[in-house]
Amino acid sequence: MKQIFIGIIRFYQKFISPMTPPTCRFYPTCSHYGLEAFQTHGALKGFWLTLKRILKCHPFHPGGFDPVPDKKDDK
């Protein structure tokens, strides 16, 4: 399951993202955040973290540095 989400993000990064202007207000970008979240936390928590991050990506949020939480914080 995790590999399917990672494949979707990589497809977006390779084929869709280059055709759009850079607009992400966060570092790392939302797609890189999603990759790291899925690789670190697996499919369910990775999906939840990525969804929360994408919902924060709007003009009224200041953005900035927002790393994926460490695996030890899963408890």
Curated annotation (Swiss-Prot):
Signal peptide boundaries: none
Annotated localization: Cell membrane
Entry keyword set: Cell membrane, Membrane
Subcellular location, principal: membrane
GO cellular component, one term: plasma membrane
Membrane topology summary: Peripheral membrane protein
Domain of life: Bacteria
Entries under HAMAP family matching the protein: UPF0161_YidD
Family: Belongs to the UPF0161 family.
Role: Could be involved in insertion of integral membrane proteins into the membrane.
PANTHER family for this protein: MEMBRANE PROTEIN INSERTION EFFICIENCY FACTOR-RELATED (PTHR33383:SF1)
Protein name: Putative membrane protein insertion efficiency factor
Species assigned in the record: Bacillus cytotoxicus (strain DSM 22905 / CIP 110041 / 391-98 / NVH 391-98)
Record lineage: Bacteria, Bacillati, Bacillota, Bacilli, Bacillales
